[in-house]
Amino acid sequence: MIRTILSRYVSSNFWSRGATFFFTIFPAFILAATALPACGGSTASSSDRTLAVTIEPQKYFIESIADKSVQVVALVPAGSNPEEYDPSPTVMKRLSEADAYFYIGGLGFEQRNLAAIRDNNPKLPLFEMGKALADAGSADLHGSCTDHSHTDLHAHDPHYWSSVVGAKALSRAAYDALVELYPNEKDKWDKGHDRLNGRIDSVKRLVDTMFANGKADKAFVIYHPSLSFFAQEFGLRQIVIEEDGKEPTAAHLRRVIDQARADGVRIVFIQPEFETRQAEDIAREIGARPVRINPLRSSWEEEILHIARALAHER
């Protein structure tokens, strides 16, 4: 059929001398040409780019900047405890196929697995997002992790994203890494970074407004110290049920209850990835309202505002 059509437009000499080239070499040339990237680097689709992160909140910062230009996979699935979760072979295979791995620094999952990740993936770029905190001017936030005037009865807390300063730092870390990995699209990353920082600033203004009328609580109880940076940033006291990362003793629970009563606590935060019975019991004991939160969800804006509304008693 093709030869019949072409014969109307080419001479008979073509079929005797050029047909072999046309039907064998030329198609191969076309296929090879279409496989080549454009000059100056290609703009790959999101299916061609996969970035691995430790936990869901990191996805928010990368995806907010990249705007569907990359796929982001979390090694610790939603609802799992990153202090205890151990990855399956399937999870580690997904990591090995990624363009880079972003880690928070300090999470139990990372402390147990980072060395093996480096050894098994020597060419995989690794980005520690927490390093950007120093550039964000967060020295005071680092100090808050052991500042008992704001955050009681707990050890080091790596939940940087629970504060605006920490969120800005993670935004910057995500931006810098995207520029390093995909420099040809820096203009896109610039716009995404500016857009994300504007959203973070908007969240800060909303929380400030909620807390400005003097009716918001100044203290709260929580099982795991996930909101240390939030507490420091907004001048709150976080009272932690967990004792040095372990189940609390009876004496520790009594101190928590006494402190909560002294501070007039009206909110006890319940976290799905941790034991909830003790938090619920304390809420009943002191007459506080239990509120379910999930600082490990990927919707950072929604979660921060949900926490603030609970403390401001805005339904």
Question: Where would I find each of the regions flagged by the language model?
Answer:
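N-terminal secretory signal peptides that target proteins for export/translocation
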Residues: 1-17
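Extracytoplasmic metal-acquisition and chelation regions
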Residues: 35-315
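Bacterial N-terminal signal peptides
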Residues: 12-13, 17-37
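N-terminal compositionally biased, intrinsically disordered segments and leader/signal-like regions
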Residues: 3-5, 21, 25, 35, ...
